[in-house]
Amino acid sequence: PSNIIAAGNRAMDEGYTHYGPSPGLTELRERIALEVSETRGISVTGDNVVVTPGAKPIMFFTMLALVDEGDEVLYPNPGFPIYESMINFAGGIPVPMKLLSSRNFSVNVDEVRSQITSKTKLMVINSPNNPCGSTINHKDIIALAELAKEYDLTVLTDDIYRRFLYEGDFHSVTSL
């Protein structure tokens, strides 16, 4: 498309012809921080943002940084297939949070609570969910956040599909 060609030419004319900074271009990081601040109701600066080539790498880096051999990781199932493979690669034990069709693929907070052990370290939240399209309501987002706090769990929230929510309200654990 002509606008992409023009943007590429403009970037070259402006000297963007070398590797950028490892965390990403400052202007992009600041714009992402503004977007997150506005959509989640939290204060984020460009210094809090790292740009990666897609969501998978940063989720993978997070798993590698936080999950040790034998740590349990709660993740939505059905869900993005890469969650389970990343947990396994990091040496963790995948613990599926079952999203059943009989519950419209919504999470059962009491069931999640029963799955938490002393080895549970991380909880993955994905809403809207891939591939089901289900969302976690505000009450359950709060309850999951409270569980994470009570059991000292880190939460990896995958909000990538929030722009594909066509009815209802988007709720993210980062807003709490």
Q: What do these predicted regions represent?
A:
Residues K56, F80, S127-P131:
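Short glycine-rich anion-binding loops that position phosphate/pyrophosphate groups of nucleotides
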Residues M59, Y83-E84, C132-G133:
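Glycine/Thr-rich phosphate-binding loops of Rossmann-like dinucleotide-binding domains
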Residues V44-V49, E69-E72, K119:
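Short acidic capping loops at alpha-helix termini that bridge into adjacent secondary structure
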Residues V95, L100-T174:
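Active-site phosphate-binding strand-loop segment of PLP-dependent enzymes
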Residues A65-I87:
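Conserved PLP-anchoring active-site segment centered on the Schiff-base-forming lysine
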Residues F89-V95:
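A short helix-loop-beta submotif of the ANL/AMP-binding
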Residues P1-G54, F61:
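N-terminal small-domain helix-loop-helix segment of the aminotransferase-like
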